[in-house]
Amino acid sequence: MRYCLNIEELFQDIDFYDRFKAAKEAGYDNVEFWGWNGRDIERIKHECEINQINITGFKGDLDWSLCDLASRDDFIEWTRKSVATAKYLGCDSIIVHSNSIFEDGSSDYSDQY
């Protein structure tokens, strides 16, 4: 079993990239975080290397849905990019949801097709 910290929720008082070191100093070898978009992937890799931290998972989807024909291609392309990013970071899993959630909390596209 691997224990990991979600550095998105912990150490919020310090810069995101400094949280890898903080996790190591707290005694952990594994971290997870939410999305990788908008983040400096090279810096994440560097922080993992210098702090000997592994990434066990991150969110690999955005607001598109595999169930929505209008955004399916975007969803698939982003998932491919997420897999490539995970491989680059040495991460062996990503979290991908098949549906985006509407503002009312639903995710049913059946009325559109």
PLM region spans:
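Acidic (Asp/Glu)-rich catalytic clusters
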Residues: 18-25, 39-59, 80-90
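Acidic-and-aromatic substrate-binding clefts and catalytic sites of carbohydrate-active enzymes
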Residues: 10-14, 30-43, 64-73, 102-105
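Short, composition-biased local secondary-structure segments
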Residues: 6-21
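Active-site acidic/histidine proton-transfer and metal-coordination neighborhood
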Residues: 69-113
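Conserved, mostly hydrophobic/aromatic
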Residues: 5, 23, 31, 48, ...
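A short alpha-helix capping/helix-coil boundary motif
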Residues: 1, 22-25, 60-63, 99-103
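Hydrophobic faces of well-ordered beta-strands that scaffold small-molecule active sites
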Residues: 2-7, 31-33, 53-60, 94-96
